[in-house]
Regions:
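Anionic ligand-binding catalytic core segments
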Residues: 8
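Short glycine/threonine-rich loop-to-helix capping motif typified by GTGT followed
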Residues: 116-126, 219-226
Length: 263
């Protein structure tokens, strides 16, 4: 809780950031887990698999779909660089959803590295890719023309914008077409493996689909990402992805996480 008034002024004058607040509210379960793993790795099994459920808080202005407090459920695997980690987490997530009564849902899957490689090949500079991805992620909401307009407003290269628009206008954006622009074929192979295996495990109970525009808003995701959408709900009911860099800040270990199922 941030101090106010004279107490805040006095705290600022100390030059010590720790004096600015009396306590904090937990934002998520992911960062604390990363710290715990880094401090206790030698005592833990490998890979390390965790399930957590607890309250978390956001500095949000309350509105539909935006809450200041909610219950977050995390399922994490740390220390597994293989795509089998993604397969397992998607399988556990979907079985949990089926067990609590969800039906007719779709698991949408993408890999940020493939998307970034495609965009860079079209002429977008590396330092603008995060911004481009955020706009591209809105494809299902604002459409191709909306994406083109927003990228133009950001004053990005006109030739790159036209290249992306032409690619979208060509029809269904397939994984093979996107992968052809990716510098590392192994990344596309891993994504194909996850899609095929997840579809086999679905056994017709739900759909599994490649979603080329899926990015997910959290900046810490580094590779494969996925979201579960359901016709009865306007937003995703579950989602997650690989976040190697976050754990790497504490210890050079790769990790994948299903980050939230809100209840």
């Amino acid at each position: 809780m941030l101090k106010r008034g004279d107490k805040l002024t006095a705290a600022l004058n100390t030059g010590d950031p720790k004096q600015l607040s009396d306590m904090g509210l937990r934002y998520d379960l992911t960062l604390p887990l990363s710290r715990y793993y880094a401090a206790n790795k030698d005592k833990l099994p490998s890979p390390f698999k965790v399930i957590q459920t607890d309250r978390v808080f956001r500095a949000e202005r309350p509105q539909k779909g935006r809450l200041r407090e909610f219950v977050q459920c995390d399922i994490d695997i740390l220390g597994d660089a293989s795509p089998n980690a993604e397969v397992e987490l998607i399988d556990v997530t979907t079985r949990a959803l089926l067990n609590i009564g969800f039906t007719g849902f779709t698991v949408n899957i993408n890999d940020r590295r493939i998307l970034r490689g495609m965009l860079e090949s079209m002429g977008f500079a590396a330092d603008t890719l995060d911004s481009v991805c955020i706009t591209f992620d809105k494809m299902d909401k604002i459409g191709a023309e909306g994406v083109k307009a927003e990228l133009t407003e950001k004053q990005l290269p006109e030739s790159a914008i036209h290249a992306l628009a032409d690619f979208i206008a060509a029809g269904d954006v397939t994984l093979d077409a996107v992968a052809a622009r990716c510098a590392d074929p192994a990344i596309a192979d891993d994504l194909k493996y996850v899609l095929a295996t997840a579809n086999t495990l679905a056994a017709g109970r739900y759909q599994v689909a490649y979603c080329p525009s899926l990015v997910r808003g959290q900046g810490y995701y580094t590779g494969m990402v996925f979201e579960v959408t359901c016709p009865q709900f306007s937003g995703a009911v579950a989602g997650g992805g690989r976040y190697d860099n976050m754990v790497g800040k504490f210890l050079g270990v790769q990790a994948v996480s299903y980050t939230h199922l809100r209840a």
